Amino acid sequence: MASAPHKIAIVTTSLAQGGAERVAANLSVMFCQLGYEVHVISINNSIDFHYSGQLYNLGIEVQTKGWLRKIQKAILLKRYLTSQQISVVIDNRTRPVFWREVVYKWVYQNRNVIYMMHSFKLENYLHKSHILAHFLYTNNTQFVAVSQAIAQEIQRKYGFKKVQTIYNSIPDFTESQAVPTTESVPYILFFGRLDNQVKNFSLLLQAYKKSGLSDAGLQLKIMGDGPDAAFILEQINQLQLIDFVAILPFQSEPFVVIQQAKFTVLSSQYEGFPMAVVESLAVGVPVVSVDCQSGPAELIQSGENGLLVPNHNAQALADAMYELHTNTALYEKCKNNAQKSVEHLSLKSIRAQWNNLLQVIYEKHD
């Protein structure tokens, strides 16, 4: 008789909007393909991305408000993990609040937990205090960082030993065939969460203004949802770009819009392993990006599949945008190299790396 499949729980804030949340959805698909029994546990009732496995939506299960709501969610999560006999948990949440993580330490008691690290801004995931971080996470805690730079920074700052880099994979649906161009006006594209503190739209819009691309007939489209949509619109008006910049709503499958862009742009203060860059290159669209910590430098070979420029420099970003638009030979080279530059992020390759890690964990505890 065949043995029952190993069980995995993926705990995520939601399955909507953010790059980390999309990664959680992609992991659920990947683990189901590997034959694991997958349980996706969403803290909030926000479900947009395609996922596989059994969904436990705590946002629906708990109806109370305030701090009591958070406590009830934690209790229900612990009960669910116990009732389903789940021994391995992948925690995909941000973890900035110490006392909340004390509660989750109790929730995860006697289980193998893999803590995802999606951002170079480590305080979003680990307490700034070395002592408190080591109280929450022992030296045997397994961390998976989505970039080499993040993994190195965790080891340097905290001294944790079990830190592994596994890049985010290219989603299945980016591997579709090219779509015919339907847009009459050419454009460049930013896509992601509309959060100025992270994505730095001020820099993006200033650079676009300086680049002169609006005069050349190349529009800028900004696609996504988030708290700073009104701020971005105000900046567009102040820079007198209202006729040249369009804000598009978030799309759970944005790849047609990406494919039709001439190139995409990233202007972030910080990242982890920016899926916007991965997804753009995967559909053959070059990227102009600032060299923020971390991720772009591990994805973009400047002059080969896009252009990488110093961060917080509007003129440098503007010059790169103008260069990729006007230098036909450079553009064609970057476009031709884009897809093959992320072949190492294929679903098959990343799936094998995850399977190897999980098999080691299960073999130790079976």
Residue ranges and their predicted role:
Residues 233-250:
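Nucleotide-activated donor-binding/catalytic signature segment of Leloir-type glycosyltransferases, i.e.
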